[in-house]
Amino acid sequence: MNAIIIDDHPLAIAAIRNLLIKNDIEILAELTEGGSAVQRVETLKPDIVIIDVDIPGVNGIQVLETLRKRQYSGIIIIVSAKNDHFYGKHCADAGANGFVSKKEGMNNIIAAIEAAKNGYCYFPFSLNRFVGSLTSDQQKLDSLSKQEISVMRYILDGKDNNDIAEKMFISNKTVSTYKSRLMEKLECKSLMDLYTFAQRNKIG
């Protein structure tokens, strides 16, 4: 099997590379940003794509969504040091085969790949957390739409309404609508509240 790694952290890339090579998986390419990722995947046609959520340019979830929309059928494993419930759920919804928390160790990537090869998904959290035992913050995060999540990430990156509108190909008015909705859903009355919420839940 072969793989493409998409991660902007040199140490993470090295750890993933070494892990894959030890398990007889060939590395076709190592990318540090999301802008060229879809094109490279479509050109090289790897069996496996490993993507960090927090890559520059086009983020990991957007790369995942685009690949699935363009009928890429290989194994996609998302890795992140961020909130595993929040990002894991959205990655599952977007078509990832697995989600691996960097905090739990990179070795789980191999477990995720093996699960995907055998027709299973690998998300190391109980689905019961999605329906029965969510914390208040997690319930709020789960209520956000994909568009609201994108707007939130851009806000946390310091982008203003004009920047967000340009990146999402929507109007300033629509950005304001999404912003108002997400602030209401998260019960944040100011941007400082939003930053505090994001820091508390390791989002950003």
UniProtKB/Swiss-Prot annotation:
Keyword Phosphoprotein attached: yes
* Residues found modified as 4-aspartylphosphate: D52
* PTM note: Phosphorylated by EvgS.
Q: Which GO terms describe its biological process?
A: phosphorelay signal transduction system; regulation of DNA-templated transcription
DNA-binding region listed in the record: 161-180
Q: Which InterPro entries match?
A: CheY-like_superfamily, RcsB_transcriptional_reg, Sig_transdc_resp-reg_C-effctor, Sig_transdc_resp-reg_receiver, Tscrpt_reg_LuxR_C, WH-like_DNA-bd_sf
Q: A Pfam family in this protein? A: Response_reg
So which domain of life are we looking at? Bacteria
Q: Does the keyword Transcription regulation apply?
A: yes
**What quaternary structure, including any partners, is listed in this protein's UniProt entry?**
Homodimer.
What is the protein's given name?
A: DNA-binding transcriptional activator EvgA
The protein's organism comes out as Shigella flexneri
